[in-house]
């Protein structure tokens, strides 16, 4: 049996037993069936104090409980107890009021001078140690430390006693003669009679994080409660998430107690009346949803919260506008944007389908290669209109295949006249290696493609904004605007067919040069399809990254400082949608009057992609109005030193662009309103049909022109 404090050998150091160092128990394990039954009953009474059960194997025959010298980091008493975060809780006990004179013994052991006002009424009132360390007798080797005692009367017969210690920072400033190695500190002598006087009411060891501070070498551990049913049931409560550095034993009652060497102290049996002053403040278990609540949650997960509810972290509802937005429609003071739901995964700015294949999301085909067929490496270029541009070259390994359902003829219509070109069945044989080459090829073509886009634009608003976006990207290094421009260039690349640099590589003679292929030799349709699908896959990845960054900017608290970057990005993405919209329309018109085998597939895929683009346009426009807090930036004053200039912090070149665009919009206001009011299947066929909505109030009567541009 180990030495107990208060015995003749109480001043001797407690020797650790390797066999019981990790687990110390006081009695044999009770009957499992009875324990489970009692535990279920206890869970019904006190569900907030329980967690999964843990078996307690018997080790010791004598009932005992372990106290710790808890001078370690990450072990603090809640500030609500003492008014500070610098004390450590060693234990809490219920004592009969008739034996409160034991506090004098504790005070002398801990170097305290008891105060007559130490007994608070209804709250803990700690002893205040003197500023100077008290002098101890040589009989007590316990270090002189600024320790405290706290009491709380619970009724007329009993009171609660809390044992408090200093924080680790105070220990680090004490003389070395006080601190010393922890293993050499003697146990605190409480006396034999102290444990016997503990109230036999209930007992529960509870390990719950209080003010837990991060520690680089000691992550927080999970809370565990270990319960059992035996009597008598004294109550002891210890709050700890720290490593126990030493321990000694005090006999209390025949109850199993678990002490972990490297974790919190845990114990058994729930109290019939849980304590309130030092009870756990852990997170309560969330109530289970009923069937109606689960259906509502699942529905909202599919729909998503509106922009305002996401920004203010409110519970949204399926309505549009939702109840929260309708509730503040008249009284709102800070957010004036529309109620929209942004499904980022449903925003599409690129032409990802293939009408010939009948695929909404085109994938690479597989072919049956000819046995022993020759592999050729061909050079491909993109047909730039500017003869001064030196186009990059893409080298692809191709092989002949056996056509099954694949058509090797290229059919198109020019001015109502149908043309048909028979091309040999060749396709890329190593698509994995070719995909990497295509990605590098797109990067090399970025600058000339931007120039090609500029040469195709005739509208001043589009030209001004494209030049400003390129300048902003080059001077600020904005990855968001850069990615949007890359998507724009990729859409331009897929708007035309690539061509071979050689005229007779596939046996195609020079006479096959046609205006439809920009006077270039066409490639086999399967090879052209493969290259365009690889470009689309690269652009879809970039689109995902751009939308993710745009979401972060839109929901940030500094939207008034990033609105210009968001505006340029949304403008370029809308211009990209307009481009692919027009390209798809041109492709459909080119197939009219042609004996095309895929007329049904083409119609279905085209209609599906058009609906996606139209929904994406509405989403991006609504997002811009949310970023701008419902305001219209190009109807405001942008004079030097004005409120807009001060809040947005735009540079001089950006201000020049804003003022120039404002003048252009005011001059063409009637034209822009007519474009916005277009309806029908091809309502975004004209340039600026989608972009004009960034400059005009919505058609539902939104009066956003009178508010300042940046959100407050």
Swiss-Prot record:
Could you confirm whether the keyword Zinc appears in this record?
yes
Matching entries from SUPFAM superfamilies are given as: Zn2/Cys6 DNA-binding domain (SSF57701)
Q: Name one GO cellular component term.
A: nucleus
Coiled-coil region(s) at which residues? Answer: 530-560
Location, primary (coarse class) = nucleus
Keywords attached to this entry: Coiled coil, DNA-binding, Metal-binding, Nucleus, Transcription, Transcription regulation, Zinc
Q: Where is the composition biased (Polar residues)?
A: 1-10, 25-36, 131-145, 269-282
Q: Which residues bind DNA?
A: 306-339
Superkingdom in the source lineage: Eukaryota
GO molecular-function term, one example from the UniProt record: DNA binding
Report the locations given in the UniProt record.
Answer: Nucleus
Outline the segment boundaries, as ranges, of region: Disordered: 1-43, 115-145, 264-294
Q: Which InterPro entries match?
A: Fungal_sec-metab_reg_TF, Zn2-C6_fun-type_DNA-bd_sf
Any other noteworthy remark?
Trichothecenes are sesquiterpenoid toxins that act by inhibiting protein biosynthesis.
Please give the function described in this protein's UniProt entry: Transcriptional regulator that may regulate the expression of the satratoxin biosynthesis SC3 cluster, one of the 3 clusters involved in the biosynthesis of satratoxins, trichothecene mycotoxins that are associated with human food poisonings.
Identify this protein by name.
Satratoxin biosynthesis SC3 cluster transcription factor SAT20
- Origin species: Stachybotrys chartarum (strain CBS 109288 / IBT 7711)
Q: Which gene encodes it?
A: SAT20
